[in-house]
Amino acid sequence: MSDDNQTKLEAADIQALLAVLPHRYPFLLIDRIVDIDGDVSATGIKNVTINEPHFTGHFPENPIMPGVLIVEAMAQTAGAISLLQRKTGRPGVVYFMTIDSAKFRRPVVPGDRLLLYVKKIKQRANISKYECVAEVDGVKVAEAEVAAMISVADENL
């Protein structure tokens, strides 16, 4: 059957994410992915809650999601769409390689719904670079470019 006749994956729920990502609580930072366009672009969703462990110390009287976790959520979204679209049966792992041009524009707080827009801008062999934007209520809160490498279990890095 050709790829044109196959059903395209348009969304991934938490079970699909758990099947491809190695991350688990408290470091799985995306709840769902929607608007998937192959391994080219997608929108990750992170529902930010006060129950997350980083809010205990960041900051007790004014809880703010650490910027590094926003970037990690972007990277997990990019990695997940890469792994969800793999044609091989061999298990893959995504290794986060670089962060470029990261900017944080406003705080993300408990109760926010973080939308993580990722778009592939470059690929060479098993390394992909993504342009990422995070928004809350239609307002850009962060942006970055991230690069990652896919490795399979029987390959050497």
UniProtKB/Swiss-Prot annotation:
Pfam families: FabA. The active site is at residue 58. Gene3D superfamilies: Hotdog Thioesterase. It comes from Brucella melitensis biotype 2 (strain ATCC 23457). InterPro entries: FabA_FabZ (IPR013114), FabZ (IPR010084), HotDog_dom_sf (IPR029069). One of its GO terms (biological process) is fatty acid biosynthetic process. This is 3-hydroxyacyl-[acyl-carrier-protein] dehydratase FabZ. The gene is fabZ. It catalyses: a (3R)-hydroxyacyl-[ACP] = a (2E)-enoyl-[ACP] + H2O.
